[in-house]
């Protein structure tokens, strides 16, 4: 099904975000990354995607927007959001068997402008 058709049916922010996360996960897999976890939750919040790229574990925040009226999707990852993601990453790592040689924090920006194909941008190690 074409993304434009799916976008036409996406009526609320939650569905738009879920579709953006699916596109982001597919994009990362196509780039050779392994998706380790999706929507990992604890009482303090949620991590969108956790992926592995060789010896690096990437904690990936996915931001999806319909347009640029409020800035790029990546600009929505505020200082407060970055701090929360760092804390959640430590909690996730504490639950795993490790060892974790390297970690990084990525942002995948998904811009879904009506009538156009989604534009996906993977920003590595941005915070």
Curated annotation (Swiss-Prot):
Signal peptide: none annotated. Belongs to the UPF0102 family. Gene3D superfamilies: 3.40.1350.10. GO terms for molecular function: nucleic acid binding. PANTHER family: UPF0102 PROTEIN YRAN. This is UPF0102 protein NFA_41430. Pfam families: UPF0102. It comes from Nocardia farcinica (strain IFM 10152).
């Amino acid at each position: 099904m074409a993304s434009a058709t799916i976008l036409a049916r996406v009526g609320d922010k939650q569905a738009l975000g879920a579709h953006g996360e699916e596109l982001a996960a597919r994009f990362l897999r196509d780039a050779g990354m392994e998706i380790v976890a999706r929507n990992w939750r604890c009482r303090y919040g949620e991590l969108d995607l956790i992926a592995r790229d060789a010896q690096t574990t990437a904690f990936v925040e996915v931001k999806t927007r319909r347009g640029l009226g409020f800035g790029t999707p990546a600009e929505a990852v505020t200082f407060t959001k970055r701090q929360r993601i760092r804390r959640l990453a430590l909690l996730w790592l504490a639950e795993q068997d490790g060892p974790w040689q390297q970690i990084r924090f990525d942002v995948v920006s998904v811009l879904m402008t009506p009538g156009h194909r989604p534009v996906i941008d993977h920003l590595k190690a941005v915070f």
